[in-house]
Amino acid sequence: SLLDRLSVLENNGKLWYNIDGYSITSEEFSYPFNEEGLKKVFSKHKISNKDIKTKNSNIHTDNFFVTKNSKIIGDIQQVNNYYFVKNKNNNISVIWFIKARNTDKNMEEELVNMILENKIPKENYSPITPYVINFAGREIKLGGSCYWTALNTVQCPYNGEMNWSIHKDIQDAQNAIDNQLMITKQRKGSEVVAEKMVDVIFEGTPTKAKQVTLKLKGITAALAGMSGGKSLTIYYVAEKVRDRNVSCVMSFWNDDNINPKTKLPPLLEEIMELK
């Protein structure tokens, strides 16, 4: 079900959601759901008069739906689906779905209704500081030195970084890591110097990962040179774990705390071993 794939984080009055490789936010505004209020909220979200606004009858309250594409990088687009909805205070809530491609209207509508009707249990919420994370149904203790850079993206300075999502099927998980790799390859300031498939054991399951080595170049390299981080190793995995379809991207710098035996830093050792 949707709740098995969903994680939520509350931060600065905004709610962040992760599911199926989407990045989603919901925010309540103090403007009433009327023409004047909507005008203000549309302009905050750069929605112009030209943008088509439709009513979605599957949402259980008055609403306007807007979809727009925007550029992520190079020729890679992301889809932005906005639901401007009337909440229980008769004000406007905005639920904004972002995904690189393959959006899922049924899931979006179901989640919007759950958000409006307060049907998401506290178990789906992540702690604001990730001392412990729920990684695809298993609790992992990280201690106090890690932080979220986005929901389901955890950074542990000198110990590695990873992001993950849980998907409705394995193809969607594969698409998610393919998209991340395409975005990485188009980033300015770095270049892919090696790329290969490697055998790994991911959360106890033997599988293949794509291993990519990235070198910084030009001014980026000069800036990073001060901390010694010159090359980044990234692993891309899509696999079924505890009955969940997981996409996961893990990375570390060459000057991180790498265990010479496992060739991995502590965060990555928690979930993967190289064969």
Per-range role (PLM):
Residues S1-E35, K39, E117-C156, E270-M272:
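N-terminal "mature-domain start" segment
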Residues S7-N89, K188-R244:
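Signature of long, low-cysteine stretches enriched in small and polar/charged residues
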Residues I24, F64-V66, Y82-F84, V94-W96, ...:
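Hydrophobic beta-strand residues in large extracellular and virion-surface proteins
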Residues L38-K46, I115, K119, Q180-K188, ...:
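Hydrophobic, Leu/Ile/Phe/Ala-enriched alpha-helical segments that form helix-helix packing faces
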Residues F64-N81, K86-N118, E139-K141, L151, ...:
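First exposed extracellular module after export/assembly in secreted or surface-exposed proteins
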Residues F97-I140, G144-C146, R242-K275:
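Surface-exposed amphipathic alpha-helical segments
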Residues E110-N113, A176-M182, K230-I234:
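Well-ordered, non-membrane alpha-helical segments in soluble/globular domains
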Residues V132-K208:
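Flexible, glycine-rich surface segments
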